[in-house]
Amino acid sequence: MTDKIRTVQGRVISDKMDKSFTIAIERKVKHPLLGKFIRRTTKLHVHDENNEARLGDWVEIKECRPVSKTKSWTLVRVVEKATIA
């Protein structure tokens, strides 16, 4: 049986935890009555073994077995580093 592993990309919104961070994934959904496209955000907790991701980074994550009560995703790679102004 070949299950495709889900991977998604999002922006790091919090990196204050040790070996963990939170990302926000944005998607656009159509409003049922107005027909206008609105943005919806999903927040996920991600396991980061080496503390690679920083606040504002664009990262790719994949689904894995539960690491803790809230973490079922792990870091694949940092797609784009955040620019510090």
UniProtKB/Swiss-Prot annotation:
Name the domain of life.
Answer: Bacteria
Q: Does the keyword Protease apply?
A: no
Q: Which InterPro entries does the entry link to? A: NA-bd_OB-fold, Ribosomal_uS17, Ribosomal_uS17_bact/chlr, Ribosomal_uS17_CS
Q: Respond yes or no to whether keyword Electron transport is given for this record.
A: no
- Which UniProt key words apply to this protein? Ribonucleoprotein, Ribosomal protein, RNA-binding, rRNA-binding
Q: Where are the transmembrane segments?
A: none
Q: Which GO terms describe its biological process?
A: translation
Task: Identify the Pfam families for this entry.
Answer: Ribosomal_S17 (PF00366)
Sorted alphabetically, the Gene Ontology cellular component annotations on this record are: cytosolic small ribosomal subunit
A molecular function (GO) term = structural constituent of ribosome
Record note on quaternary structure:
Part of the 30S ribosomal subunit.
Name the family. Belongs to the universal ribosomal protein uS17 family.
Protein task: One of the primary rRNA binding proteins, it binds specifically to the 5'-end of 16S ribosomal RNA.
Could you tell me what this protein is called?
A: Small ribosomal subunit protein uS17
What organism is this sequence from?
A: Actinobacillus succinogenes (strain ATCC 55618 / DSM 22257 / CCUG 43843 / 130Z)
